[in-house]
Amino acid sequence: MKVFAFANQKGGVGKTTSAVTLADGLSRHKIKTLLIDLDPQGHLALSFGLNKSPGLYRLVCLDEPLEKVVVTIRPNLDLVAGDKQTEKVKRQITLSDFRENILSDLLADAPYDAVLLDLAPSLDVLHLNGLIAADWVIIPTRPDALAVDGVKEILTTMAEVEQSGHRYQ
């Protein structure tokens, strides 16, 4: 399984759209794909015409198994949706032991070929979990000063994650 994180410290640069587009392409090529919304805005669900739901909250805070919280979009494409309850996920992770690896641990035995993480444009414990779980980080951006600054910030954070021993592919 490969894990891709879509990250930028700047909002509105195309993280969600990029994640949805890649997930669509992978699933159409029969690659079993899971999208996980780590953003409290819950835009991944909206991208598929679904209502926001507390899938991530149920997975992390209520310890429900992954297969109970996924929504199947179509064959080879599943979603763990997010909503405002994602803020509670951040608090739960903050109180946990080994908090930086919670997402990695939850995904360890996931039955997918690819997992795509849509990260919020913030730097918090959930964002860090996404970066640590990722094999690859995709940084969508626009050609403007604020978006480029967001790229610099995420690259700095990734370097810090690598200093702790994590290696991106």
Model features per residue range: what roles?
Residues 1-169:
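P-loop NTP-binding core
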